């Protein structure tokens, strides 16, 4: 058996959890996904089965996300699961978000989060982070084809942002960088 399958990945599961479940249920060992979704993210996880896994490296199409960004605090992992490293009293305005988003369109340099599966010297970054070790991380070029504010709750400082981007883009890094651009 071979082919492609779009699977809904719920919050709280890793992309690997989904693959492991499918391997167990189908009794097929050759199963892989086309890109990792963070455990706190939910959405469609494209799966390749059997000989289709050989095509994963050729699936370079853009990806689209809707992210929920919370202003007023910064975490070490750039997401809600991380430890808060800084808080901000001032609220951001919707117009300021709209203006700042324009600087993210096109080819940008993005610093991956320390809590990520990117490997340096054969070891995943999150392994270094959990050990409390610092490593030099190089920024990566990514393309943001479209980024737009869908909604904004001023009182709670929560924005819903649509992003169409190249493979390898970290939405968490965009959230962190947007916060920095807004001094928040």
Label each residue range with its predicted role.
Residues 1-184:
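Catalytic/RNA-binding core of pseudouridine synthases
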């Amino acid at each position: 058996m071979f082919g492609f399958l779009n699977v809904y990945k719920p919050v709280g599961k890793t992309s690997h959890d989904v693959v492991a479940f499918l391997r167990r249920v189908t009794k097929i060992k050759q199963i892989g996904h086309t890109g990792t979704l963070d455990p706190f993210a939910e959405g469609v996880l494209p799966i390749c089965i059997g000989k289709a896994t050989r095509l994963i490296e050729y699936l370079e199409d853009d990806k689209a996300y809707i992210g929920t960004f919370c202003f007023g605090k910064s975490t070490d992992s750039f997401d809600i699961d991380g430890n808060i490293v800084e808080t901000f009293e001032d609220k951001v305005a919707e117009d300021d978000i709209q203006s700042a988003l324009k600087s993210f369109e096109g080819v940008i340099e993005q610093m991956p989060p320390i809590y990520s599966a990117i490997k340096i010297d054969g070891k995943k970054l999150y392994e270094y982070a959990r050990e409390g070790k610092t490593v030099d991380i190089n920024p990566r070029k990514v393309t943001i084809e479209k980024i737009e504010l869908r909604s904004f709750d001023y009182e709670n400082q929560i924005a819903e942002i649509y992003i169409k981007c190249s493979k390898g883009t970290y939405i968490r890094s965009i959230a962190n960088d947007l916060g920095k651009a807004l001094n928040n």
